[in-house]
Structure formats: structure tokens, C-alpha cells
């Protein structure tokens, strides 16, 4: 169990730091997204002429918000779950079931990692240029010049998958430690501000 705890502590600290930064960026992305959508509604219905880039900008914010918040929700148990069977099982059975589901999730995440990189970020679409989003002040960056490269949007999926893999490995280690009787040595991951469906 000492080896597992030695693996868990650095990973837990890394996830704490990375997910805290991701949360701040995700909240900023949400604020930008809301402002862009409200601005688009205002310009469309009041001035009868909405800028064409606001929709794509809002989508950009939504993708990054989702990619950065999904790992935090996964870690804190914030996803919707049907846990009747888990609650009906004894503690060891519930932990084994949770461990099996986390291993299946890990396998799915590894497949998604490949798809996120090869089918989105490093694909023909990902290498393309945005139709309407441009860098401010006419700045030219890379092969797309003043337009955003699509990779900046599609990278949200791949970054989110990487963070989900880190969280999944941490949760697997925590379940293994629980099976070995070390549950009392684990810190509680549920945030105080995390809403639940209980």
C-alpha cells in the first residue's frame, strides 16, 4: 500500500493544481461565451446586424469550458450516475465494481485520446482556418495569417481527454488503496461547492 500511496500523492497534487487552473480558465471561457451570446442577441434584435464571428467565438468558449471542467466533475463525482447496484453491494463489492468501471473508462479514454489527436487536432479539419474568428488588431499567426487555426478549438477535446486520463488513474489508485484497507488515509475529493443529486 505504501507504493500506491507514493504514486497517489504526487498525482493528487498535480491534479489539484492543474484542475484549479483549468477551473479558472473554464469560468473565464464561460463568461466570454455568455457575453458573446448576449452581444449577438442584442446586435441581432436591436441593431438588426449581428457580427458573424460571435457564434464561433461562443462555441470556442464552450469547447474549452467543457474540456477543462469535465475532469473536475469526474474527479468529484459530479457526473450523472446510476448507483443503485453500487449502493446495494457491500463496501468491497462496491469498490470492485467501481474499479472495474474505472478500468473500462480508462480503455475508452485511451481510444478517445487517439481519436482526439488524430481525427480532430491533427486532421485536415484541424489544420484548417476558422471561417470567421480572427486575431485582434490584424495580427498574423502561423499559416492562417489573421484567422484562428481550427486546432485551437479542437485541442479542447484532446486536452480534456488528457486531464480525464490523469483523473482516472488517480481514481483507480484510490480504489486500489481502499481495497487494501487504506480508505481512512485518503483525502475527500468532493468539493464543498459541488452540488449533488442526493
For every predicted segment, state its role.
Residues 1-198:
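Alpha-helical transmembrane segments and membrane-interface helix-loop junctions
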Amino acid at each position: 500500500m505504501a507504493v500506491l500511496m507514493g504514486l497517489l500523492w504526487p498525482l493528487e497534487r498535480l491534479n489539484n493544481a492543474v484542475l484549479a487552473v483549468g477551473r479558472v480558465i473554464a469560468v473565464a471561457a464561460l463568461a466570454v461565451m455568455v457575453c458573446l451570446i448576449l452581444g449577438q442577441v442584442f446586435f441581432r434584435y436591436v441593431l438588426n446586424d449581428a457580427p458573424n464571428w460571435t457564434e464561433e467565438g461562443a462555441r470556442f468558449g464552450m469547447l474549452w469550458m467543457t474540456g477543462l471542467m469535465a475532469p473536475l466533475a469526474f474527479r468529484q463525482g459530479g457526473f450523472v450516475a446510476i448507483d443503485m447496484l453500487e449502493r446495494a453491494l457491500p463496501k468491497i463489492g462496491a469498490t470492485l465494481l467501481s474499479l472495474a468501471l474505472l478500468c473500462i473508462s480508462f480503455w475508452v479514454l485511451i481510444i478517445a485520446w487517439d481519436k482526439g489527436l488524430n481525427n480532430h487536432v491533427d486532421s485536415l479539419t484541424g489544420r484548417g482556418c476558422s471561417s470567421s474568428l480572427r486575431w485582434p488588431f490584424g495580427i498574423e499567426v502561423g499559416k492562417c495569417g489573421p484567422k484562428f487555426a481550427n486546432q485551437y478549438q479542437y485541442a479542447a477535446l484532446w486536452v480534456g481527454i488528457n486531464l480525464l486520463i490523469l483523473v482516472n488513474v488517480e481514481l483507480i489508485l484510490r480504489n486500489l488503496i481502499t481495497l487494501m484497507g487504506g480508505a481512512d488515509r485518503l483525502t475527500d475529493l468532493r468539493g464543498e461547492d459541488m452540488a449533488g443529486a442526493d
